């Protein structure tokens, strides 16, 4: 197994078992440049490893390495993923530094200069804190110092956009539930499946989404929540809300102070932002590269570059930075950072985003006026990666939720949904919502997190990262986040509104199977 192959989630690696390495054979046809030469030639490997073509007259010609783009991989059904070296050309430290350096060189040309925003995930924050044996707050403050040295403008927290994702997911679930059980009673006579049926499957994990699109296609896609992940919601907020409401205002205020009336020419566009996220998982690079998150008008992606937690360590080495010796910068962007006045992080229970717990409590209140204030008592499956919880009223099960992490549990969920549909089982035996994550133990154990070469040490590292995730936090419900509510009121016209559905929701696409002779093993 190559060094990079364990970076992606297990569901992105095909085989019959949980952990599967990606195939080394890519079936994507490569466009071959036609040559006018009709003579015979042979291919030879040079001492330095280069492949050369030798013609009949002895002339040597170096052969170019066949390459495919990340978008090629996403649009191809030949495999679930490909090797890391194939996938990530524009999602690397070198690309990040190239953009940062180019931006610094454009200081004298304001038309070319971009505002650089970095969004940090709480899982990456916890992993770095565990690795350096410091607090998560110190991690943030030292990162702030480090990024200032690179002339990065802003450091944001993806927990902020997670609150939007939770609220939209919960409202979407309630709408589906009402349509299925209350309004139409699921149209039992015709057996017609609702356009957005139950169970609703969570959508925050890009590894799971990619797997669903390529292996189960049209059957499973209607069940998946249309709500964007926290990463992509932050991409929308940064490129559109932040640009329009904050940066534009600041620019116009500066122009007014300078008696410059040419404000229209100084309007900041989404393409003037370079947005980088730091995530626990390499699959997030796939997500950011989806065409659904590219704006043709402004020619920009919502998230321009994704760096994993481990790549931040590589970045420190590249810049010859002793992270622990960095001073701690106390200036934190209040609106887009989940930090209380007492310097504690606002959080919600669950190191993978807390979708099951939040939606379960939200639905119980909205649908049945039941307040769940006590800790949820889960029924544990064969391991901690599969949990169930249900709500009963007058002896009837009215909500049935599950959490499924890891490939095997995901397969079991998909099989159960298929069985329930084909056999038309009693709805009481079905799930209403399932929180799905590709990685065992969820996002805190993502393939991009900092791990040890000694496998036996990784369990302790995982436990410590989990502790760091819950260190120095205040649990707060997303609905109590006043900054989130302000954006809903001033920009989105409310939760799950038409504007919210336009900006905070997405769609999925069945990837057609292709037949290619290169895929045949003789």
UniProtKB/Swiss-Prot annotation:
Residues reported in the UniProt entry to bind [4Fe-4S] cluster 2: 205, 281, 439, 443
Listed SMART domains: Fe_hyd_SSU
Protein's name in the database: Probable cytosolic Fe-S cluster assembly factor narfl
Organism, scientific name: Dictyostelium discoideum
Its job: Component of the cytosolic iron-sulfur (Fe/S) protein assembly machinery. Required for maturation of extramitochondrial Fe/S proteins.
Primary gene name: narfl
InterPro entries linked: Cytosolic_Fe-S_CAF, Fe_hydrogenase, Fe_hydrogenase_lsu_C, Fe_hydrogenase_ssu
GO molecular-function terms, A-Z: 4 iron, 4 sulfur cluster binding; metal ion binding
Keyword Iron-sulfur: yes
């Amino acid at each position: 197994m190559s060094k990079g192959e364990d970076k992606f989630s297990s569901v992105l690696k095909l085989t019959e078992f949980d952990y599967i390495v990606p195939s080394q054979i890519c079936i994507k046809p490569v466009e071959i440049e036609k040559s006018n030469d009709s003579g015979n030639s042979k291919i030879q490997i040079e001492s330095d490893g280069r492949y050369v073509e030798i013609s009949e007259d002895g002339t040597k010609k170096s052969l170019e390495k066949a390459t495919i783009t990340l978008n090629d991989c996403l649009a191809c059904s030949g495999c679930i993923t490909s090797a890391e070296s194939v996938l990530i050309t524009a999602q690397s430290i070198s690309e990040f530094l190239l953009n940062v350096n180019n931006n610094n060189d454009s200081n004298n040309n304001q038309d070319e200069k971009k505002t650089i925003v970095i969004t940090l995930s709480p899982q990456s924050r916890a992993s770095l804190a565990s690795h350096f044996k410091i607090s998560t707050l110190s991690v943030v403050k030292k990162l702030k110092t480090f990024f200032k040295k690179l002339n990065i403008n802003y450091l944001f927290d993806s927990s902020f956009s997670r609150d939007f994702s939770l609220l939209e997911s919960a409202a979407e679930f309630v709408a589906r539930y009402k349509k299925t059980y209350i309004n139409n009673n699921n149209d039992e006579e015709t057996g017609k499946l609702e356009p957005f049926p139950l169970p609703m499957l969570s959508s925050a994990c890009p590894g799971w989404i990619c797997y669903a699109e390529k292996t189960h296609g049209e059957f499973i896609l209607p069940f998946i929540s249309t709500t964007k992940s926290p990463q992509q919601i932050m991409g929308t907020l940064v490129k559109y809300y932040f640009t329009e409401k904050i940066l534009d205002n600041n620019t116009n205020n500066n122009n007014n102070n300078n008696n410059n009336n040419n404000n229209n020419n100084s309007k900041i566009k989404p393409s003037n932002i370079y947005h980088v996220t730091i995530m626990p998982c390499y699959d997030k690079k796939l997500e950011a590269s989806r065409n659904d998150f590219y704006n043709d008008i402004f020619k920009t992606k919502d998230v321009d570059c994704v760096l994993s937690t481990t790549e931040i360590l590589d970045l420190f080495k590249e810049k010859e930075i002793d992270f622990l010796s960095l001073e701690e910068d106390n200036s934190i962007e209040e609106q887009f950072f989940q930090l209380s006045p007492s310097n504690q992080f606002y959080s919600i229970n669950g190191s993978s985003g807390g979708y099951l717990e939040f939606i379960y409590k939200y639905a119980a209140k909205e649908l049945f006026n039941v307040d769940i204030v006590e800790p949820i008592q889960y029924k544990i499956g064969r391991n901690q990666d599969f949990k169930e919880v249900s709500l009963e009223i007058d002896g009837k099960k009215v909500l049935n939720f599950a959490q499924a992490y890891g490939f095997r549990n995901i397969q079991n969920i998909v099989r159960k949904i298929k069985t329930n549909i084909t056999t038309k089982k009693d709805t009481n035996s079905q799930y209403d919502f399932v929180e799905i994550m590709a990685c065992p133990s969820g996002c805190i154990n993502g393939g991009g997190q900092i791990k040890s070469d000694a496998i036996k040490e990784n369990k302790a590292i995982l436990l410590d990262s989990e502790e760091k995730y819950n260190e120095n936090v205040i649990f707060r419900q997303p609905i109590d986040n006043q900054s989130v509510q302000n954006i809903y009121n001033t920009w989105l016209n409310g939760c799950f509104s038409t504007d919210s559905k336009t900006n905070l929701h997405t769609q999925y696409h069945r990837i057609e199977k292709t037949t290619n002779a290169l895929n045949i093993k003789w």
